[in-house]
Amino acid sequence: MAASGWARAAVIFLCACDLLLLLLLPPRAFATEGPAETPGEATPPPRKKKKDIRDYNDADMARLLEQWEKDDDIEEGDLPEHKRPSAPIDFSQIDPGKPESILKMTKKGKTLMMFVTVSGNPTEKETEEITSLWQGSLFNANYDVQRFIVGSDRAIFMLRDGGYAWEIKDFLVSQDRCADVTLEGQVYPGKGGGSKEKNQTKQEKGKKKKERDLKPRASKEDNRAGSKKEEL
């Protein structure tokens, strides 16, 4: 009986020691213990460290922006022009007798450029001042136009909405110092380009008069030469 009592006491003591160890040891000590890896199994690759945003270069920023564009719904107006859906064409508003009406509809919402020539052989500074006044007038009329000087007498007017290009063209050609406007390959003479055309017509008329005067003189000389031959 005494031996069995001592055995029970020893078992109870051992159980108490195990419980104390479980309570005192941290849980990580048990988490690290796991089944041994088999020789055929490969260890998973270490997780790639995330790059600090302060160390991003241009390529990283471009990839990040592209990812944001994929994840977020971007408004149609913020999309690049080549990604925007083309505006539907209302064929009821197209006049078959006016080709410009078709171009207005097809260029609506698209960027468009036109070339403007200033008359009077101006300097680049004068062209800058004159075209700046034209741009200001268009801005006051709620037209979004950007201007770039490309020569001593030439400038580019760029529109974000090409549907208004022909209205702006009509305004420009009515200005006193506008020689011409080139839009979609078509040259439209301006109010300031009339003097050149008048000079050209005067020169052409003068040439025609000279040709007319030379013809009777040549015929008279031919007649004189013929009469001399007859006398001989």
UniProtKB/Swiss-Prot annotation:
InterPro entries according to UniProt: MESD (IPR019330)
GO molecular function, one term: low-density lipoprotein particle receptor binding
Glycan-bearing residues: 199
Gene Ontology cellular component terms for the protein in this record: endoplasmic reticulum
Motif (Prevents secretion from ER): 229-232
Region (Escort domain): 163-202
UniProt-annotated stretches for the region Disordered: 32-54, 185-232
Location relative to the cell: Endoplasmic reticulum
Keywords on record: Chaperone, Endoplasmic reticulum, Glycoprotein, Signal, Wnt signaling pathway
Low complexity bias (residue ranges): 32-41
Keyword field contains Chaperone: yes
GO annotation (BP), single: protein folding
PROSITE patterns assigned to the protein according to its UniProt record, in alphabetical order: ER_TARGET
A Pfam family annotated for this UniProt entry: Mesd
Coiled-coil intervals, chain numbering: none
Gene3D superfamilies: 3.30.70.260, 6.10.250.640
Biased composition (Basic and acidic residues): 194-204, 211-232
Complexes and interactors: Monomer. Interacts with LRP5; the interaction prevents LRP5 from forming aggregates and chaperones LRP6 to the plasma membrane. Interacts with LRP6; the interaction prevents LRP6 from forming aggregates and chaperones LRP6 to the plasma membrane. Interacts with LRP4; the interaction promotes glycosylation of LRP4 and its cell-surface expression.
Protein role: Chaperone specifically assisting the folding of beta-propeller/EGF modules within the family of low-density lipoprotein receptors (LDLRs). Acts as a modulator of the Wnt pathway through chaperoning the coreceptors of the canonical Wnt pathway, LRP5 and LRP6, to the plasma membrane. Essential for specification of embryonic polarity and mesoderm induction. Plays an essential role in neuromuscular junction (NMJ) formation by promoting cell-surface expression of LRP4. May regulate phagocytosis of apoptotic retinal pigment epithelium (RPE) cells.
Protein family per UniProt: Belongs to the MESD family.
UniProt protein name: LRP chaperone MESD
